[in-house]
From Swiss-Prot:
Active site (record annotation): S156 (acyl-ester intermediate), D322 (charge relay system), H350 (charge relay system)
Stored Pfam families: Peptidase_S15, PepX_C
GO MF terms, alphabetically ordered: carboxylic ester hydrolase activity; dipeptidyl-peptidase activity
Record InterPro entries: AB_hydrolase_fold, CocE/Ser_esterase, Galactose-bd-like_sf, Xaa-Pro-like_dom, Xaa-Pro_dipept_C, Xaa-Pro_dipeptidyl-ppase/CocE
Top EC class, one word: hydrolase
Superkingdom of source: Bacteria
Family stated for the protein in its record: Belongs to the CocE/NonD hydrolase family.
This protein's name: Putative serine esterase Rv1835c
E.C. numbers: 3.1.1.-
GO annotation, cellular component aspect: plasma membrane
Keywords, in A-Z order: Hydrolase, Serine esterase
SUPFAM superfamilies membership: alpha/beta-Hydrolases (SSF53474), Galactose-binding domain-like (SSF49785)
Amino acid sequence: MTRRGGSDAAWYSAPDQRSAYPRYRGMRYSSCYVTMRDGVRIAIDLYLPAGLTSAARLPAILHQTRYYRSLQLRWPLRMLLGGKPLQHIAADKRRRRRFVASGYAWVDVDVRGSGASFGARVCEWSSDEIRDGAEIVDWIVRQPWCNGTVAALGNSYDGTSAELLLVNQHPAVRVIAPCFSLFDVYTDIAFPGGIHAAWFTDTWGRYNEALDRNALHEVVGWWAKLPVTGMQPVQEDRDRSLRDGAIAAHRGNYDVHQIAGSLTFRDDVSASDPYRGQPDARLEPIGTPIESGSINLISPHNYWRDVQASGAAIYSYSGWFDGGYAHAAIKRFLTVSTPGSHLILGPWNHTGGWRVDPLRGLSRPDFDHDGELLRFIDHHVKGADTGIGSEPPVHYFTMVENRWKSADTWPPPATTQSYYLSADRQLRPDAPDCDSGADEYVVDQTAGTGERSRWRSQVGIGGHVCYPDRKAQDAKLLTYTSAPLDHPLEVTGHVVVTLFITSTSSDGTFFVYLEDVDPRGRVAYITEGQLRAIHRRLSDGPPPYRQVVPYRTFASGDAWPLVPGEIARLTFDLLPTSYLFQPGHRIRIAIAGADASHFAILPGCAPTVRVYRSRMHASRIDLPVIQP
């Protein structure tokens, strides 16, 4: 399955698009409002194949977005598109065109409280927003062109909307593809390792607030005001008065960064939690949530039993540099075991627009994302023989080896190979035999992973991910490096680190980076993990969803502050990866006490940390190694 030139092209020779439906050329556009049960009007764009006969019946793709379903060009520019809207997200535009040409209707939706839709947003993915999805499906299946079958998909927020649509258990929805999207809001994006991802909640919150005011130029640049008026009004709204009314309704939208900043633990309840507000403003819960706490009530993991009961097949789709979402895709795949579900993990950034190679940098992917989604959805919706039904359910890409591999589950069978922190900043395969040994590190609170990291990729519709030579940053960190390898070493799965530490503080943030040092001394980033020390307690209790890494609750009742000077054990996982270390290269772990580029710095002065490496307190990293 290796491709020449290091390509990430698919494991099959070419997309097999055999379909029970004919192919079409061109699209027919219309838009309208659909009124929900509470009177809120939701804006919808509909795309049908051009030349569709009145007798034809098609399945539909439902795509619900928080980032505008489309834009309106100013006069006379809009005449260049024949009055049709401007499709501002290139990946969605290509996907829409591909699916419509393949015999699907495509429905774009501005979710409640966003775009040209009315209503206010009291939280993301509210129970009202989820219920809207079922009513929109009802509207779709009533249309004369619909055959009664609906699939849902999307990247990022839109992918989560597709997943939560299944909470309704609507019989028309047979398959979804949540791509590059979260599963557990707390650990996947808002608080990885229990540390507030402050850059994300602040930046994403400000961008959304600007979009909700129809101020696109504040997100993409001042020039955006020149060609567009903003979000696309529906066709009946010729004077844009309805759009203006929707924008006015958005003034009541909530502030995600403010709420996130008020939380520490998974079970914290925000003062502005919409599920516990005044009776006349309180949201009615939906589904059968398994955990309490403000952040859990907007998280897909909390409703996995409802999603499972839908019976819909799910394609969990992500990339190794997609923020924390590769692990999200894994957790979803392992937890929601509906028949026909698949998992794919490629060498991509958020939304898959770039292929990331730790040794060679960025390139455009050869992988046909839209063709792969068509293979999956055609199989489940049209019963087409696309080949996917006979394949193993898991495919993953091993970087450096540049090879797609398959498995029946995740992680693939591996042997744990431990490397121990040792004297002289060495990383050794043999456990220490000394009675004492430690290294002292004064936390450098300026340390960070830069402006083109995996965490920045989550904002800006899939930004570039490129980690430059880490040598300069590593000078700020505590590093341990192995001897040069004498053979290739494939690491696939979840790396786990165990640190024995003392600190001058009662809390702290710990970041561990797995790196590759080449023979010239260049340092390449592979993956990372983090943990806030107050969350260090491991739990033997049943987790809320299936786990294959050390489990902790992140609940307030399990808080465990450090005692200055007392040795504490920190065990946590790094984000999953599949990477081949080459002969002559060295393995490095780098330990930091801050990532100022992305995560909140705890109040107080920079602590001094001691990392122990003795017989009794053997700090180590456990690598899941695939034997050749």
